[in-house]
Amino acid sequence: MKVNPNEIELLISAVKPEQYPETGLSEVGLSGRSNVGKSTFINSMIGRKNMARTSQQPGKTQTLNFYNIDNQLVFVDVPGYGYAKVSKKQREAFGKMIEKYISQREELKLVIQLVDLRHNPTEDDILMYNYLKYYEIPTFVVATKEDKIAKGKVQKHLANIQQKLEMEPEDEIISYSSVKNNKQQQIWNVIEKYL
């Protein structure tokens, strides 16, 4: 799958279902805890520097951001979870917004769940994965920050994540570095299977 980086646009930042765009395209959700590098991942996958705004402040994305990717699919950036400085009320509101989207959106074909390759999945990572499985959403786990791990240890870290998440055999996992940017085609190939 090839995408033209010049044909990418942010359609809308939505907080409720009536704002979701009607494009007729399949959607791929991107979830992950705050600061796992979702915006950086989006930018590296589409070959644009600042399409998805990156922030040093975790918990910045508070809307569902719908990106039309070259009229081939829509990336949906979901608010990061597990950020302590967000009030309980805000967390509950995010939770409801995400649940509505995941449980009711027919266009949603796949969720890419980003986890940090360097660490064990957090309780929130495990909850999110189980939540996606509860709603029978195909899930593709991308373990970010691969460049921060010695090459010989990557497989061990991936196996650990698979075990801790109790991943289903049909769900795929890959390690990725936005710095190296060398596995984009593999990731697009997995995405393409679900469109």
Swiss-Prot record:
Q: Does the keyword Amino-acid biosynthesis apply?
A: no
- Signal peptide bounds: none
Q: Which cofactor does it need?
A: Mg(2+)
- Keyword Cell cycle tagged: yes
Q: Which PROSITE patterns match?
A: G_ENGB
* Binding residues annotated for GTP, in chain numbering: 32-39, 59-63, 77-80, 144-147, 176-178
- EngB-type G domain: from which residue to which, for each copy? 24-195
Q: Which GO terms describe its molecular function?
A: GTP binding; metal ion binding
Q: Which residues bind Mg(2+)?
A: 39, 61
Q: Keyword set for this entry?
A: Cell cycle, Cell division, GTP-binding, Magnesium, Metal-binding, Nucleotide-binding, Septation
GO process terms (BP): division septum assembly
Kindly list the GO CC terms recorded for this protein.
Answer: cytosol
Superkingdom is: Bacteria
The free-text function statement in the UniProt record for this protein reads: Necessary for normal cell division and for the maintenance of normal septation.
**Family from the record:** Belongs to the TRAFAC class TrmE-Era-EngA-EngB-Septin-like GTPase superfamily. EngB GTPase family.
Q: What is this protein called?
A: Probable GTP-binding protein EngB
Question: What is the organism field in this record?
Answer: Staphylococcus saprophyticus subsp. saprophyticus (strain ATCC 15305 / DSM 20229 / NCIMB 8711 / NCTC 7292 / S-41)
